[in-house]
């Protein structure tokens, strides 16, 4: 092949794309990354939690040099009604290994740093350019068309986000279904470092991750989130796109009401809004995955549906990193064989099965389980009402605790409780 042909062209400088570029460049591959934003991370929106295990494997001790915000040591899961909340609070005071922890991050900073690591290893980055088409020759992907220029490569890695038009043009995926994605909105609220630590009972670089179900999305599938950064809070909500047709409020109004909730307002009081962003995020996991491998092409990251909403936590960044690493390993093996056919690149699935797909397969039925209106209406209301009755003393004749609980459980329906409980046991 000509010297003008790259070993790999990667579309998208998010986590999957940057990691793929880093791993490839370390082995001497000629890599070009094309990012439509003005910088790596400019187009990325996330709540902001990175589970460290996948990147720790690639860059040991990365937290010592990367622009992380806080190490998550406090977990809060709240069930909310319009005026109340019942919260499960967990604090981890034990020492954990570098691969067991998680961090709050700001993607604009973190992605830029990660791409810098790839560039230092030898990868090339072009920003502010949109890839319009994938170039094919005799049914095989041989490059991309960007800004009117044809750039050739032995293999193309598509890491261009949840709504990958390039994968759609190749026929590797269908147009994204509304039931497979959610609309996410996020505000970045600035507060003094010591104020954040005082309000969330943190010390040093400790951080908190908070998830909220019920009222934030007005009873629709989704939820609210809050992550503590060093001097800011990442606050927002995510709502299933196909449920918005039934919404009585707009998503911006949901966010405003969420901010005014008595369980949230004191946490953000006095804060200054410094950033607002909205984005479409994958929600269906394996149920929305495209064909991941083609002749001369691989798909990774959000474009490959690498996201898991487990209810009690949300994962996406660590899966994207693992997918980027898997894509790079696959390309390196293909380079040794000088074979970039679909069959040769099929090794990608094996690498994924040993990493992110293993986790995603275990929870692949969970999205359907969570797509149950009782999860965001009846159950939060039941939890809050039970807590209210347990903690209220008004001088009236005492009622046995079991009767208080049964009274509210009856409103949900014992058959519904049994049915949902059994289904939950089978999917978790």
Curated annotation (Swiss-Prot):
Pfam families, sorted: FAD_binding_3
Function statement: Could be part of an electron transfer system required for anaerobic carnitine reduction.
Signal peptide residues on this chain, from the entry's feature table: none
Keywords attached to this entry: Electron transport, FAD, Flavoprotein, Oxidoreductase, Transport
Gene Ontology MF term list: FAD binding; oxidoreductase activity
Cross-referenced InterPro entries: FAD-bd, FAD/NAD-bd_sf, FixC-like
Species of origin: Salmonella typhimurium (strain LT2 / SGSC1412 / ATCC 700720)
Family: Belongs to the ETF-QO/FixC family.
Cofactor(s) needed by this chain: FAD
Protein name (database record): Protein FixC
